[in-house]
Regions:
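RNA pseudouridine synthases
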Residues: 1-133
Length: 133
């Protein structure tokens, strides 16, 4: 789950954009010669910004962050692919559901977390840009 800036063009979608390491050795970029990267999303709430449920079909470094930034909708608070926001000291991204098979009992385990209260505030409040010197 993530809060992205602005309103997405569609209530659900699939971002299929290959990623590779940028020349700076830190950032990832969308590039035709990159590794396959596919992200599905579904809008959960939309106001000034958008709360999205995200499903990764691949697992590339920074995949969610780069894919939404490439659409022009970076994650709120993302200092690498968007801009810092004084309201949140990290990017607005949280795993809300985790499924796995217990290796001992072989039972399917599901753990879920609620939407952080801060995420709902980020939907409507104006961004507070951190001053730079």
């Amino acid at each position: 789950m993530a809060v992205v800036s602005g309103k997405l063009p569609s209530p659900k979608g699939e971002i299929d954009a290959p990623l590779k390491l940028a020349a700076d050795g830190i950032h990832r970029i969308v590039a035709a010669d990159g590794q396959t990267a596919v992200t599905k999303y579904r809008v959960l709430k939309e106001k000034t910004n958008t709360l999205v449920d995200v499903q990764l079909l691949t697992g590339r470094t920074h995949q969610i962050r780069v894919h939404f930034a490439s659409l022009g909708h970076p994650l709120i608070g993302d200092h690498l692919y968007g801009q810092p926001d004084a309201r949140i000291p990290y990017q607005a991204l949280q795993a809300t559901r985790l499924n796995f098979t217990d290796p001992f009992s072989e039972k399917r385990i599901t753990a879920e977390l609620p939407v952080p209260a801060l995420f709902n505030q980020l939907l409507t409040e104006a961004p507070q840009i951190e001053p730079t010197i």
